[in-house]
């Protein structure tokens, strides 16, 4: 899938720079010195009136966090302007939950990465399990969307994860490895070092089952080894956990060696819960 360049006649402002992991060598990377990142994924929730209070509360709470805890929210695309208006100048960056694989053209309903960047956004989630399941997004399509995000100056949050059937079949590493490899194959080492990867075990979301911190860490360690094979700088990519993180399990999860934070769903819709998760991330940085 090939996309053409930006539309003629559009003057584009550079996208906001997303907070990046520290630039360390591979040996340092395998330590626990990476900064934490907590990103809220609102999914298809929100309205202008309710969003304002939530965004303002999160911005106020984030101001009290240590510098090595980074915070973001990925809102529905119609609320990008509101997020920019209320969060600009705060510690919180903003983004979207999906982008088009195309840069422009007759693609009704699609939103191009560069359009998102026009709102000084930092993040674009790509390959979320709900997109893969409900919209039949392939690993190849996710890889192309990752490229589009990087070209627009956005930081793609690349989601990978396995279903319950795949986990019970012992195929977890094979599944997430293929999903990640498809993306890495299209990127240079320099480009790959600019992504964020989120592991979301589909089997642990809404199934009554839960992933232990040890299970989550095992997959994160595998993903980091896969990233390291791309290059020393890529080994330092931020790895988020996205399997129903809540205030009561966040600190244990974030204390794991290769878990650098979380991609937060339902809990990101309540400012107290979301900020409690951010504070849990801060507690783990203080302990290292």
Report the location of each language-model feature:
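Active-site loop-to-helix "anion-binding N-cap" substructures in soluble metabolic enzymes
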Residues: 2, 7, 12, 17, ...
């Amino acid at each position: 899938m090939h996309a053409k360049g930006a539309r003629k006649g559009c003057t584009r402002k550079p996208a906001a720079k997303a907070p990046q992991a520290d630039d360390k060598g591979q040996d340092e990377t395998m330590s626990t010195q990476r900064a934490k990142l907590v990103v809220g994924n609102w999914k298809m929730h929100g309205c202008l009136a309710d969003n304002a209070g939530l965004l303002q509360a999160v911005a106020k709470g984030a101001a009290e966090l240590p510098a090595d805890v980074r915070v973001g929210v990925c809102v529905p695309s119609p609320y990008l302007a509101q997020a920019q208006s209320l969060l600009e100048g705060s510690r919180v960056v903003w983004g979207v939950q999906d982008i088009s694989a195309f840069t422009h053209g007759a693609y009704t309903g699609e939103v191009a990465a560069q359009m998102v960047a026009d709102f000084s956004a930092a993040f674009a989630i790509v390959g979320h399990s709900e997109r893969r399941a409900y919209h039949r997004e392939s690993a190849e399509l996710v890889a192309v969307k990752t490229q589009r995000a990087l070209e627009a100056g956005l930081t793609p949050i690349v989601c990978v994860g396995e279903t319950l059937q795949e986990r019970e079949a012992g195929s977890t590493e094979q599944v997430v490895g293929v999903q990640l490899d498809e993306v890495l194959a299209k990127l240079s080492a320099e480009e790959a070092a600019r992504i964020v990867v989120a592991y979301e075990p589909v089997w642990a979301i809404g199934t009554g089952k839960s992933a232990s911190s040890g299970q989550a860490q095992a997959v994160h360690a595998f993903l980091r080894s896969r990233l390291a094979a791309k290059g020393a700088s890529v080994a330092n990519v931020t790895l988020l956990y996205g399997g129903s993180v809540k205030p009561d399990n966040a600190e244990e999860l974030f204390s794991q060696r290769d878990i650098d934070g979380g991609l937060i769903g339902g809990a990101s819709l309540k400012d107290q819960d979301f900020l409690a998760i951010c504070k849990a991330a801060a507690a783990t940085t203080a302990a290292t």
